[in-house]
Structures are given as C-alpha cells and as structure tokens.
Amino acid sequence: MPRSPHPPRRATLASLAAELKVSRTTISNAYNRPDQLSADLRERIFDAAKRLGYPGPDPVARSLRTRKAGAVGLMITEPLDYSFSDPAALDFVAGLAESCEEAGQGLLLVAVGPNRTFEEGSNSVLAAGVDGFVVYSASDDDPYLPVLQQRQLPMVVVDQPKDVPGVSRISIDDRGAMRELAEYVLELGHRDIGLLTMRLGRDWPHGDPRPALADPERVLSPHFHVQRERIHGVYDAMSAAGLDPSSLTVVESYEHLPTSGGAAAEVALEVNPRITALMCTADVLALSAMDHLRSRGIYVPGHMTVTGFDGVRDALRRGLTTVKQPSMEKGRRAGHLLHNPPGSGLPVIDVLETEVVRGRTSGPPA
C-alpha cells in the first residue's frame, strides 16, 4: 500500500483535549497540577497522549508563561576535566544535584574555565536559562561575577569569593581547620615544613604553569580566599609555637593535574632538603606527593609526614592525615538556600563543621 504523501499531524494539547472531550485546562492540569484530577482521569489522559504521540507541554512555552526556567546554574571557573576528576568537587555537585532534584529543578553547568575567551564565557552566563546561580570557588577578581550579577537573579557563593555584597555564602573555617592540623604537625616535632598549595591567582606565576616556589607577595595577597586562609592557618600555628612563618616553604601548583602534587613536592625538597613534613591544601596534592615520594624511596611516615585537606574517600582509604570537610553537605545547603532564601532578605553566611583526621601518614621527624 502506498504511503500517504501527508505525514500524520503531531498531536497537540488542543487535539488531545478534543479527543478526550475535556478542556485544555484539564489536560494541562494532568501534567502541571496532578492533584487537581482523579487518578483515573490522569491515567486516561496519559494513555491517550501516548497513543496519539503527544509529548507533553512545550517546556519553552511553559518557561515563557511562568517566567521560570526550572533549573539552577552552577558556575564553574575550573576546566571541566578537572572539576569532574576532583573528588571534593564531585561530592559538592552530587549534593547540589540532590537538592535541585528535591526542589523539582534541573542543574545546568555554566563553564567559564581558563580555556574560554571572556566573550565565550560571558555569553554562557548571559544565555543560561536558569532561575538562579550557585558560584563554586571563584577568585575574588573573577571577570564573570559582574556579568552574572547583571542577570539580577538569586545567587549563592560556595567557599569563595568572600564578602560579595548581598550574597549568601556556604563555607568552612579554612583558617581554623588548617591551624588545628598544623598544630598537630608541630606537636609531632616538625620544624622544617613545606606547604603545597593549589593556585593562588588566575595568572601563571612567573609566566609558567609548572609548580614553583611562591614569592611572598603572591602568598600574602592571593585572589583565592580559600588558599589564603589555609596558608595563614599554618602561619598562625607557627607563630603560636614561636617559629618564624617566613621559614615555611610554600610551593604553588597552578595546574590541577594528577601529577601536580608530586611535581610540587619535588620543588619543595629542592628548595629545602631539610623538610620533614609536607602539608597540602588539598588531598589530591597530598596523594600525588605520596606517590612521588615512594618512587624516590622516601617512605611515609617513616621519612616524611604528609597531610592533606578535604577528606575525600580515596584519601581516607589510604589513611591520609587530613581535614575532613562536608563537601556534599555544602552542595545540599547551597541548593536549599537558593530555593529557600531567607525571609529577611539579608545574606546568610553558613559555616559548616570540619574534623581533623589523624591518619597513618603522620609521625615524628626521622
């Protein structure tokens, strides 16, 4: 039998209503307000929709009608390959996604990493179909924050930047947590300490992305608040112990690669071969440093103490001495705060608890 030259017309809300002899409002309620209809009527509508090929209300039309996009935008300033390989970041995203799902919202990644031009990143921020933004760990001089604020949408910052006027923030006491960990390292008897940090600014130090000794000016005024606070936590502990904080060997790892911690550890030991403890501002740096030390025949903790920060699963499994922070809870809280803003209209600063985990990678100096 020859096919009809005219394909069947796509079912619409109106044609489905006519088929079932009900109003368009009834069809709309089946999808948008199911509590308004009986279970039998909803089932009859969905069965007919499936038979006729009706896909449901047009999401674009619904968005225009309600002025709601039904999604939260997550602005990520790191390369996506890093964001999806960093366990702490993954836990945060999982918590945020869980919160969005509970609120009936989707989650849209707005990637504005260093590999994009400013124009590309700005277009992504301005074109994102979202009802609000969560900003995850951006520098205080991030160029996209002013662009995002042009949208005049609800916003929550996680970790950094600090003190964005009128914006709520979810964070931990990075300085206090790192000080507590450093006090423990000092109690063990360590005096020659290396500190391996994540990047301190958006620009390359010395025009080179490889790990390098951080100069005092860059250490004292980094644009990443979290790294600054963790560095100063170690300084606080050293000062309280009567030590000169300037004796701390600080190495910045600009690139976030699987081998970055090992490369940074090598630089630290070249600068100060007397180092007996390597403290790291992230577990991923510490785990990489441990692998590198082992390849050189430097055993942990027999020859070297190594500590991290985050408390990711792999670090805890390997017995890393670290600070455990609630990364997944950060995501949940950020989503909840965005979906349920304070009635006062004033920003909320929510500081979550941390825990120092004394693992198997710390001991007295050899």
From Swiss-Prot:
UniProt KW Transcription keyword: yes
SMART domains: HTH_LACI
The organism's place on the tree of life at top rank: Bacteria
GO molecular function: alanine racemase activity; DNA-binding transcription factor activity; transcription cis-regulatory region binding
CDD domains: HTH_LacI (cd01392), PBP1_LacI-like (cd06279)
Keyword DNA-binding carried by entry: yes
Key words, A-Z: DNA-binding, Repressor, Transcription, Transcription regulation
Domain HTH lacI-type: 11-66
Residues within the DNA-binding region(s): 13-32
Pfam family, one: Peripla_BP_3
Disruption-associated phenotype: Deletion mutant has better growth ability in a cholesterol-supplemented medium compared to the wild type. Deletion of the gene alters the composition of the cell wall, leading to its remodeling. It enhances the hydrophobicity and permeability of the cell wall and resistance to ethambutol. Deletion of the gene also inhibits the host innate immune response to M.smegmatis, and promotes the survival of M.smegmatis in macrophages and infected mouse lungs, leading to reduced transcription of TNF-alpha and interleukin-6 (IL-6).
SUPFAM superfamilies: lambda repressor-like DNA-binding domains, Periplasmic binding protein-like I
Functional description taken from the UniProt entry: Transcriptional regulator that negatively regulates transcription of the mce4 operon, which is involved in cholesterol transport and utilization. Acts by binding to the promoter region of the mce4 operon.
Name assigned to this protein: HTH-type transcriptional regulator MSMEG_6044/MSMEI_5883
Record lineage: Bacteria, Bacillati, Actinomycetota, Actinomycetes, Mycobacteriales
